[in-house]
Amino acid sequence: MSENTYQIETRRRSRSKTPFLRSSCDHENCEHAGEEGHVHHLKRKSAAPNVQTIIEEHIVESSISKKTRAKAFAQLTSDYSSDDMTPDAKRKQNSITATVTSILTKRSGGATSTPRNRSQLETTQNTLNSAQEKLNQSNGNLSSGNVSDYLAYIEYRDAGEYWNKTPKTDYTYSELSPHRRQLAPGIVAMPNMSRKSLENHNDRVNYMVQQNPAQEEFIRRRYQSKYTQQVNYDSADELDATFGQQKQSWWLIRLIQLVVSSITTVWSRVTNLSATETTAYQNYHAKRQQSQQVGLWWKIVQTIGGGLASLLRYLYVFIGSVLSLDTWLLRSSDAENKSKKRFLIFLLILLPLLLLSGWLLLQEDQRSAYVQRAEALLPLPLSIFGSLRSRFSNAGATLKSWMEVPTVRSPQREAEAIKVNMASIEQNIQKALTAEEYENILNHVNSYVQQLVELKMQQHSKELAPQQIELFVKLMKENLKQIMYKTELSEKDLSDLAIKLKLELQSSGGWQDGAKLSQANLEEITKLIKAEVHLHESHYTIQLDRIDFASLLERILAAPALADFVDARISLRVGELEPKESSGSSDAEVQIERLNREIAFIKLALSDKQAENADLHQSISNLKLGQEDLLERIQQHELSQDRRFHGLLAEIENKLSALNDSQFALLNKQIKLSLVEILGFKQSTAGGSAGQLDDFDLQTWVRSMFVAKDYLEQQLLELNKRTNNNIRDEIERSSILLMSDISQRLKREILLVVEAKHNESTKALKGHIREEEVRQIVKTVLAIYDADKTGLVDFALESAGGQILSTRCTESYQTKSAQISVFGIPLWYPTNTPRVAISPNVQPGECWAFQGFPGFLVLKLNSLVYVTGFTLEHIPKSLSPTGRIESAPRNFTVWGLEQEKDQEPVLFGDYQFEDNGASLQYFAVQNLDIKRPYEIVELRIETNHGHPTYTCLYRFRVHGKPPAT
């Protein structure tokens, strides 16, 4: 039986990125696979706690001995027949094998940081290796290819129903799988695989059918050997799906690049606008001087060439943009994209209509401003039109200035232009300011202009001195001489002009060397010269009429000689007026007017200040009203608090007084009963109604039974007088004994009653907690809640220095709900990282969601700690929309690691989070043999409370004590 037993090792989880370590000996790296007696070291796999031991037995009867069975070992258990078997094998086919398969679940130390659950199938590859050697020895004439095929056939034939016996690594429901996690009866969770399942196989097949296999690039990528070697674990369908995803995502990259390039282009244009204007201003005078030196024809050619070059450049950019847009719209011919293309074409048609309607709604000044801005920013037909318009307008103005006689604008037209300009400026100011601000500015301007006009009138009313007039005439003569000097031509200038004229005539072909001027020609030249001189004289006359006397007067007044002269005249006049003490009415009127102006200005300022003060007073009054309301509320609150406090004190005093009265009333009653019992009043009363007698009856009975002291002394004195000394001594002795006995009995009874009442009152007081104690308890509970709800230090808190080292092969769960999307295209999916599990925020949805089991979380604490316990927190059921917390962790374990890839971790404990318990549950360390501190802790979540898709981890705390320094 043991000879026929073979082991099939559980396959490893394919393509996992988990940093697991290989065993020192496995099937792929074993160098002694063919040796006899060599046993492979099985890899230790994780198994769920609910995996049960399953034993399957397949027994086939046989009549052959063990020797025959050993010889025919190549043929193991099989119910199948084959025609490819050799005759020797057919003769030795009748054999018996019994396969016993068992799964042993055992927790032990492993070679990696994975769980110590081990799945062992009692079938091994050594049997197949030995069978291969025996088959090679018996069938030496077979080729190596046939042997390998035969062994593959034997392996599949002997495995039987391997799909039910061998654990799978993909989406599986096999009860033998070590990765099986049963969340609830009938609900099995998908294992945590890095490769997706075959659930999208039909979609990939449909995609393959739609592709054209005749495409050269598709075939080359599909069957290229070098590309296939890079992805050894990918199937052909997965490659097809990858190519499809790449093909579908390229247009998204194009869109992102287009948006980024547009933003950068606009930003560069805006930032370079000022630099361009500065360069234009700097090059303006240089270009103008150069244009003055260049001839007429060269200017015309240069203007036409520049315009054509700009037109061709912008035309090229426009054609390229249109072609790119057409390519983007017509890039695909799928039927699914027709609606999308129609919508995009509709948007492209709608955009110019919207721009045109917005342009018609704008005003003229706004249109001009937008045109200038667009000409500076956009390299589009609008910019082309603007640049061409400016170039043609400049060229036309230049030609007009060359060809036409310069004209002078009339003063009326200039005045009209100035009025139009002032009206536009006034309209813009009214739009930019409010009515009140505009009126204030007008008032200030009017007052300022009025002051200037009055000052000018005063200055014009004064007569100029002869020296000032002479100075004005001198300056005007100098200016006129300079103007005349500029208009006069010297002999050198005339000769140069004649030479230039001769050269121009020679170049034009109209010059003849032997030609002479006739009398008619001379007369015509004389007329032209006179007309030109007359034209220049009229021009200079007009120029003299157009002299700005205000600027000329300003220059004259700014001359230093005039300032010295005026100062001298003023000092002389002041010296003459000092002896005189006459104050005429004119000076008083001037001062009164000046004071009136100052008063008007002060009134305007005071009105502004008064308006500001009114607003300030209004705000202060509002603040006072709010303050009075707040004070009234505070007083009402204080009164209510005082009333509540006084009522509470009165209630406490009433309770204390009632308690004291009840205690003393009971004590008095008990003392009264004791006295009645001692003195014998109960026996003397009929019917035993002593308990119902009042104090008056008791006092009457005592007086009747006993004698007062004074009366007794009087009687005793009389008796002593009548009796001898012996009788008196006997009476005194008897009274002393009687009183001592009575006092002792009274003391004992009173002490017993007082002690009993004290015990009863103590028990009663123990049942009633004082208000101060209640407040102290509430303060203690609130202090614990404020201290992170636990009152313990969390050494895994991220803000305190904790960090996430790894999640191993755990796959995070994504909701696929796009946070940012453009035209329905998702650009960014928000996900919560594992760092949320060590952050203090616990709100619904603020958790780390992962799929599959087990879920790993490796934490690094902020320091070395003697770990004492853990706290796992989840949202309560009251905050869940469904009223359930199925995604909460259930079974989990905590391990201590010396390093991230520790091969021998230490188990702190195996715990279970109760969904019916509190939302915050504390778990103490179960392994009390741990005597060393740890800095790295690993959390492994095995199951949850029934959610089949994902598990949520809200907050995990690690508590402990730091080592003593």
From Swiss-Prot:
Record's keyword annotation contains 4Fe-4S: no
Membrane topology field: Multi-pass membrane protein
Subcellular localization(s) per the UniProt record: Membrane; Cytoplasm, Cytoskeleton, Microtubule organizing center; Cytoplasm, Perinuclear region
InterPro entries reported for this sequence: SUN1-5, SUN_dom
GO BP, sorted A to Z: double-strand break repair via homologous recombination; nuclear migration; nucleus localization
Annotated TM spans: 303-323, 343-363
PANTHER family: KLAROID PROTEIN-RELATED, SAD1/UNC-84-LIKE PROTEIN-RELATED
Protein name: Klaroid protein
Classification lineage: Eukaryota, Metazoa, Ecdysozoa, Arthropoda, Hexapoda
Encoding gene per record: koi
